[in-house]
Amino acid sequence: MTVATPNLTTVPVPPSDSRERVKQFMQTLQDEICAGLEALDGGGQFREDSWERPEGGGGRSRVIREGNVFEQGGVNFSEVWGEKLPPSILAQYPEAAGHGYFATGTSMVLHPRNPYIPTVHLNYRYFEAGPVWWFGGGADLTPYYPFAEDAKHFHSSFKAACDRHYPQFYDVFKLWCDEYFFLKHRGETRGIGGIFFDYQDGRGDLYNKGPAPSGPAGQKAAEVGIVSDLNWEKLFAFAQDCGRTFLPAYSPIVERRKDTPWGDRERQFQLYRRGRYVEFNLVYDRGTIFGLQTNGRTESILMSLPPLVRWEYMYQPEAGSREQELYDVFLKPQDWVNWPTA
């Protein structure tokens, strides 16, 4: 099924105060998440570095290290603007050429010390350039040891957020997340996914400008068809709801796992699997690529990387082990919302 994209003249116009409103929300989201994580950790506190970008803009980078729960994590807010659009944007939106741009967002990655607590990532962003604007973002979970109830809770939380705004959001954005967080050179997903969306501007279908229209996410979006009743306000409300879904989606998982005993075997496997996180972020991640292309703050861009990591040549998990279960079940796309749990 081929879905025609409406003419550019049909793009809904954002409000005149769009940039300020989104910026304020992204800052508030950073504040709320940091406060919630400090309470969850019970010991660690975030250190803040404010920075300015010579070409225009700046941000606040907050890092927590050596806490009771979090070995290292970062929550970053940024807003940047400029006249020269990066190649990654022009490739998608040639009509933005000749216009200045504005981008703002909040991103987060947490690397817990206990291998039974999953790593988690979040990012919500907004972009404007002349007649072009869009929202993007999502959240995904990367466990080291498999717990179906954790995967089900995380996915169910974000499905509920999606369903509050548009009933087909989760169906498309879950598949898009599975597609995006996939390491092609390894043939495996980065974790159990979550939701991911990009280029949402109220026109076209929900997989607007996605790279694989014939894949599962593109096909599901084609089944849904063009969504004609989404505008700037509705998409902004959706992004806000998703941002505030993170803490109730993740905190119960941490509470369940933080006191689970672990030893050197679990630690070594955690460090090995963290290598996949490094590989993805340096090879595939759009946010990393965009930040480096726009002369962003390198320390903030690379704050997603874990403090310790290791690689092992030709590693194979032991047959019948929980590590093997991770590979067999949890590093492949699954219907986690409907997964049976005890």
Curated annotation (Swiss-Prot):
Its EC number is 1.3.3.3. Keywords: Chlorophyll biosynthesis, Cytoplasm, Heme biosynthesis, Metal-binding, Oxidoreductase, Porphyrin biosynthesis. Homodimer. A divalent metal cation binds at H111, H121, H155, H185. InterPro entries: Coprogen_oxidase_aer (IPR001260), Coprogen_oxidase_aer_sf (IPR036406), Coprogen_oxidase_CS (IPR018375). It comes from Synechococcus sp. (strain ATCC 27144 / PCC 6301 / SAUG 1402/1). Pathway: Porphyrin-containing compound metabolism; protoporphyrin-IX biosynthesis; protoporphyrinogen-IX from coproporphyrinogen-III (O2 route): step 1/1. It comes from the Bacteria. This is Oxygen-dependent coproporphyrinogen-III oxidase. GO terms for molecular function: coproporphyrinogen oxidase activity; metal ion binding; protein homodimerization activity.
